[in-house]
Amino acid sequence: MIPVLIVDDHSDIRRLLSITLGKEFEVLEAEDAASALDAVRRHHPKIILLDVMMPGKMNGLQMLEAIKTNPQTQDILVAMISARGQVADHDDARRRGADAYFVKPFSPLQVAAWVRSKVE
């Protein structure tokens, strides 16, 4: 199964996406950037679904930049998930290397369709 990493500090969001994707993908979960980066090193997921605003030393945009500037991880597809839906937020994420941007509340089926389209 293809590994997909869900990174969000809200367990209900992780659970919703995990249930939606769990039958087709190996779902990995992390609640912050530190544990997510550890999961990236250990499992090298094909796709990361990454919350923008997270607690800790690194937010989602900083983690995105770390992934996309590292030659060992730059090929991982990253979709940002955020409550911030302004055009400037989308543009900032794209400039840092985001492959997609979903605004909360999002449709888990839409996210799953995007994930499927990237691995087929």
Q: Regions from the language model: what does each represent?
A:
Residues D38, L61-Q74:
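Short amphipathic alpha-helix used as the core "switch/output" element in two-component signaling
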Residues M58, Q62, G85-F102, A113:
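Alpha4 helix (beta4-alpha4-beta5 surface) of REC/receiver domains from two-component response regulators
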Residues H43-L50, M54:
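Active-site beta3 strand of CheY-like receiver
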Residues E29-D38, N59-G60:
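Helix N-cap/capping motif at the beta->alpha junctions
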Residues S11-L28:
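Two-component/phosphorelay signaling modules centered on CheY-like receiver
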Residues V7-D8, A30, I48:
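Conserved sequence signature across two-component system core domains
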